[in-house]
Amino acid sequence: VRAQEYRAGGARLSYHVTGEGDPIVLVHGLSGSGRWWRRNVPALAAAHRVYVIDLVGYGRAYRQRALGVRDAAALIAAFTDDLGLERVTLIGHSMGGHICTHVAALRPNRVRHLVLACASGLLTGNIYRVALGLPKAAVTGRLAFVPRVLADAARAGPVNVWRSTTDLLGDNVAELLPRITARTLVVWGARDALVPPRTGRALAAAIPGARYEEIPRAGHVVMVDAPARFNALVLDFLAEDELAAAGEA
């Protein structure tokens, strides 16, 4: 699928689109790219229009200075505005979940569902531990995925990875969480070595009505480690809302 570009304020997002239906926007994490969703897109696109984003400074949108989480969220909010996306499901992994939390707060009328996978946002810690913990966190899961992690980190470059890490550790979403109105699913890998499951439980407890699901034997890159289970959790969560809407009609 050919990549498209969205430009605003001197920044460039890269994205590609597949499928038809209500929109799903996938936002990758620190040092990642849209390719991290490769095992999820076919299942999600069966009944939805899926937008797979490469954040500024990452993936196909590299050779740019990475944005902080709040600026990245403002750009994605503008992206949903300009493309006229309604009833949006935002799915974010790690830093992408952190960004999606901000987007849900910025656009409560557009964002209907929020899925946070091993998300930062309540993460505290030493920048060296977080930046250097990424390769270790990947190794706790599917070993065949490690080359992708390293290739994407190399493409983004150490300066962007460092900049993003510094920014996300300085940004805490705790005060936003009680105001989130989107139906929210929080999914975690039980073996997440970077953002521990207790952080996921705290996120879910702070968001009104949020559900928490933990996948055994999956690590930080939960949607790669356990794609079938991850896809089923997300699709079941979305289907519940569709059934409820049909019942009200």
Residue ranges and their predicted role:
Residues 180, 186-188, 192:
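Short beta-strand/loop motif that positions the catalytic acidic residue
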